[in-house]
Amino acid sequence: MHDHPDQEVPRRLEELPSFGGDIHVYHSAVATFYAPSDLCGTGGLRRELIRLTPSFYGHERRDTVFVVLDDSKDGMEGMEIGRVLLFFSFRYRRRDFSCALINWLVRDEEPDPDTGMWTVRLECDQRGQPTVEVIDLDTIARGAHLLPVYGSSKVPDNFSYHDALDSYNSFFVNHFIDHHAHEFITAS
């Protein structure tokens, strides 16, 4: 799916483009999207804040997002999930670039037969390290709500939801969080 691990990298630093400008870092981004069954607001347009903060109520917060990879495909067939590590922008050759650094979460081939929800897990490279990629901010459609696949063991009493994305191996993509998410994810 992602060709970045196999992509040929220039052998010498001199072959890379030179950049000496400023890089601006942000702790949030706003996703604006059309929710066809929600005509409140401006003709069905909705806004959603995607957070990436070092301290949100005393804990780090790194939201997950839907990344559109192929807009010719419906629902999850054309998207993947990413966990935002960094929002940043820069200017290069008189052009502005707004980007996000993300960890990819790859989905299973089919939704879970018991819940009807897609499941995702952190994508890792050949060494077991999470993959990261810089993407254009415009490819982020909206925030994604993930639920841990708990398994059969008991969740510890002192477990905090702040640690869920770092503590579980796989997650359900919750299309029941709101009616737009349901339409958006299950579109066919």
Annotated model-derived regions:
Residues M1-S188:
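Terminal interaction-prone segments of large eukaryotic proteins
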